[in-house]
Amino acid sequence: DFENKQLSAATAITSGQPMLAGEEVFPVIETVNALPEVVAALEKRGVGEGNGLCLPRTVGRFFSNLADPVNSRLVRFDCLNIQGQSGLEILPTTSAFARPVEGLSILVDVEDATIIELSDSFAEGGAPPSDFDVIEFHEGALQTRKPLSPVRINQDEGVNFSISGSQIEWQGWRFHLRFDPRQGTILNNIGMTTETGMRPVAYEIAMSEMFVPYQDPDQHWFYRAYFDMGEYGFGNMASELKGHDCPSNATFQSVVLHTAVGEPFTAPNRICIFEFDPGYPSWRHYESLYAGVPGIETHHSRRATHLVVRMAATIGNYDYFQDYIFQQDGKIRIRLIST
């Protein structure tokens, strides 16, 4: 009850589960990595103490033969060899995902940190090696090309869009922008201004889900078919935009998210809004019929400018850019980029 600022009813929903939250898995990560059975299995594979890291993955409705997937919070851990020469105090390597440890999985109920199953396909030996060399992924360890001459973007006369609260207007476009823990950026009430008023285009534009099926029948891989939005949350996994994530003429917005227990917090610079020249004209025509006719221009072109609303989500070892692109000719494009 918003008027009286009080809770009027609370009903438990048993038909689904909320997204995985960091607060519930972080303690379990420590527990699993300290298990003597896990430490021993890693050592048999040549992964010494402090050089192994096991992380949880969602499992959907799999493993119903071992536990109730509806009323349990099941995750399955797989492990990585993180041995390296990064010079970091926290992790020995900056290429943590480069060396997966195959044939070892731990099924856990994070509700009470119960270890349901430890599956080791190479308990008797013969595991594939995971101690091969990797390239450390930081500037000091990588050879880089000669720097490019700078390509600069500037808008000396200011931007062409306006922001009023959560409403954005640009070149006749008007829309409401909000941010959701599951879906990330969401556009509402999108319309185009005309001589007779606002022409509605869409009530809502948003990504509903991202499904990532690995499609490997191996017993340690078959369950890896992730719903990145429903299980992890594009908004929850959104990372701060900085560096070269957005061009220098971008406007940044922070968003309000909440913890697993509902406490709000501000997440800085999760959205950027900018205009850019796509490098091709919005319209171009050459009329050969009038070539050579005095006083008639045979070539015509109009410069294009697009408006972009961008966010970036980092899910495991994947980084995704989600762009909503508005064009002057009335088109809206949705672009998802995996970097």
Regions found by a protein language model. Give the residues of each.
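Amphipathic N-proximal alpha-helical interface segments
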Residues: 1-13, 92, 108
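Beta-strand/loop-rich accessory regions of lumenal/periplasmic or secreted enzymes
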Residues: 15-339
